A protein has these predicted regions:
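Exported/periplasmic ABC-transporter solute-binding proteins
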Residues: 1-156
């Protein structure tokens, strides 16, 4: 399974232009506040801001989602005008509208994998779970939970 970085806004507000790197840069500069998550997607957003050369202008507007708080909370309450997080976390969140994935030329895909620790107390049960998740029969359940089978949030 994999998930890309996506963009969301509070439900019902106009969706910003994120169709290109330059459009995203402009959107970041004009946003009043910017939410980003912890982990790889948040690190990637910070690196993009640095790459765009707008760190000094953006830093005062950045709001990192605290551990245990979801991005939709910041967006729905207006603490963040625009938010960045794994698409799998944004796609079904209440109170927000998913805008879309980052442009492909600046996208970062996070791949999720499963393994069985060598010191597992129940290696056979773990192997059965991993096998079940990898089986084609699991796809409908995974799609329901993740909403989209494609890491960029598109229907395959």
């Amino acid at each position: 399974m994999a998930s890309a970085v996506g963009v969301a806004v509070r439900a019902g507000v106009p969706k910003p232009d994120i169709g290109s790197s330059e459009a995203l840069r402009t959107t970041l500069l004009t946003a009043k506040s910017i939410g980003y998550s912890t982990g790889p997607s948040g690190d990637h957003v910070v690196s993009l801001i640095e790459r765009f050369g707008i760190t000094d202008q953006i830093r005062p507007k950045l709001k990192q989602v605290p551990t245990g708080v979801r991005m939709e909370t910041l967006l729905a309450t207006g603490e963040a005008e625009i938010g960045f997080q794994q698409i799998s976390e944004l796609i079904r969140a209440p109170g927000i509208d998913y805008v879309g994935p980052l442009p492909s030329e600046i996208q970062k895909i996070t791949v999720y994998s499963a393994g069985i620790p060598s010191n597992s107390k129940q290696p056979e049960a773990a192997k059965a779970l991993v096998s079940a998740l990898a089986a084609g029969d699991a796809a409908p359940v995974i799609i329901t939970v993740w909403s989209r089978p494609d890491p960029l949030g598109r229907w395959a």
